[in-house]
Amino acid sequence: MLIRLTPQMKQRLTRRAHEMIEHSLALFPELQDTLITVGYTRKHLGSATVIYRKGSIDRMIIRLKVRGVTYQTIGHELTHLIQGLAHGARSAAPDKIPSGEKQCDIWTLARDPLFCDDAPTYVKMPRRMRERWPDYALTVRELCIAAIQKRHTYRQYIRWLEEEIRKLSKQSRQAKSIAPAQLTLPFII
């Protein structure tokens, strides 16, 4: 793993965030021999940039907001770098990650349960699910894996995934409405 920190990031990077970045990078074997510049951003949770020079990759940069950084954000930005690789030497690879924010969220969640610590930003889901993300995280991850498999034969796999997520939210709501909210005790006079 080759990481270069920008001067701004050197000033702000906490040990926790540095360990999170290294742990996340270990789950991206495609980036193992690549120098990745890690910078700081104030405006967004994160961003990723792949710079090309004369048709080949010159630099790969991710920028993160250190305060409150999550594995999901780090994984999402690293997945963007892999999407950028698709335009270079990997362009003939059949299993490349398609470009786009929703696709990036789907492939990030499917990669490893580590990246399920926070709800994805771009995949549509009910607010209730986002608020109670830990209850749904692993099930949504399984749906993301299924959507990637479905992609080979079904072009609207993202629409399918978002519909399944919506159904999942409704199912859990119905299950909770059937069960009593509080136990009742018999009233004896």
Where are these regions (language model features)?
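Auxiliary, metal-adjacent structural segments of Zn-dependent hydrolase domains
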Residues: 1-67
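Non-catalytic architectural context of zinc metalloproteases
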Residues: 3-5, 71, 137
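Short pre-active-site segment immediately N-terminal to the catalytic Zn-binding motif
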Residues: 58-74, 94-98
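Active-site recognition of the HExxH zinc-binding catalytic motif
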Residues: 72-85
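Substrate-binding clefts and substrate-entry loops adjacent to catalytic sites
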Residues: 84-95
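Post-HExxH zinc-binding segment in Zn-dependent metallohydrolases
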Residues: 94-128
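Long, well-structured alpha-helical subdomains associated
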Residues: 114-189
